[in-house]
A protein has these predicted regions:
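Generic, ordered loop/turn and secondary-structure boundary motif
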Residues: 9, 13, 131, 135, ...
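Short acidic, glycine/serine/threonine-rich loops at helix termini
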Residues: 116, 139, 167-168
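Iron-sulfur (Fe-S) cluster-binding modules
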Residues: 14-19, 41-45, 61-70, 93-95, ...
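FNR/FR-type flavoprotein reductase catalytic core
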Residues: 1-135
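Local cysteine-cluster metal-coordination motifs and their immediate loop/turn environment
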Residues: 29-31, 109-110, 131-161, 190-205, ...
């Protein structure tokens, strides 16, 4: 690595609350972890829902248990926890009368959109963390543009955290699809490099494209 730029964006703001639930999808557990831990240290009652396609993609569950009052797990295939999506668990909790001052959702964009679809009708404060494609990290390239409350924002400068109830997720998902071909190329190149280096079958890598880290690939020997 010859160049490094950071930190980008603005610091995360933790709001005053009595009961907060975090919702993490895949690697979203990593940035969610320190936020919920800090809230717990402040005396906030903290719960978390962790989701993944299967058990091996459910991250930091044991670590969350050290300070969260309740840890819920959902997997697409039912290999761990509830079979289904994190939004199924969230909806069930709300329907059973659980009251949350805020929901913090971090994960794939479709997951965060689904969370907002649950919380918006209930007018529950919802924070999301956006990490779309970024090239220069200064807002000049415009790749990470997102509409929030009808205003243009840039995730690298104004984010990554935004009011989820105000994010135009449909536009965001459309813009992300614009770079699928480039992401596929990066993934294929990474696989070839892993093969050349003889990386083991278990190795998993997060590939940085510009200043973004959204493309995940498994190296195969």
């Amino acid at each position: 690595m010859t160049d490094f730029v950071g930190p980008l964006g603005v610091p995360t703001v933790l709001h005053e609350a009595k009961h907060v639930i975090g919702v993490a999808g895949g690697v979203g557990s990593a940035p969610l972890f320190p936020q919920l831990r800090e809230l717990a240290n402040r005396g906030v009652d903290v719960d978390v829902i962790i989701g993944g396609r299967e058990a091996q993609y459910v991250l930091l569950a044991d670590e969350f248990k050290k300070f969260c009052k309740n840890v819920y797990i959902a997997t697409d295939d039912g290999s761990l926890g509830t079979k289904g999506f994190v939004t199924n668990v969230l909806s069930d909790l709300i329907e059973k009368g659980e009251s949350f001052d805020e929901v913090i959702a971090i994960g794939p964009v479709p997951m965060m959109k689904a969370v907002v679809n649950v919380t918006k009708p209930k007018n529950i404060k919802t924070s999301v963390s956006l990490n779309p494609i970024m090239i220069d990290g200064t807002g000049m390239c415009g790749c990470c543009r997102v509409s929030v409350d009808g205003k243009i924002k840039f995730a690298c400068v104004d984010g990554p955290d935004f009011d989820g109830l105000q994010v135009d997720f449909d536009e965001l998902m459309l813009r992300q699809r614009m770079f699928k071909e480039e992401e596929h190329t990066v993934s294929e190149n990474a696989n070839r490099m892993c093969n050349l280096m003889g990386v083991s079958n278990n190795a998993k890598h997060v590939i940085n494209k510009g200043s973004n880290a959204r493309t995940r690939t498994r190296c195969k020997k």
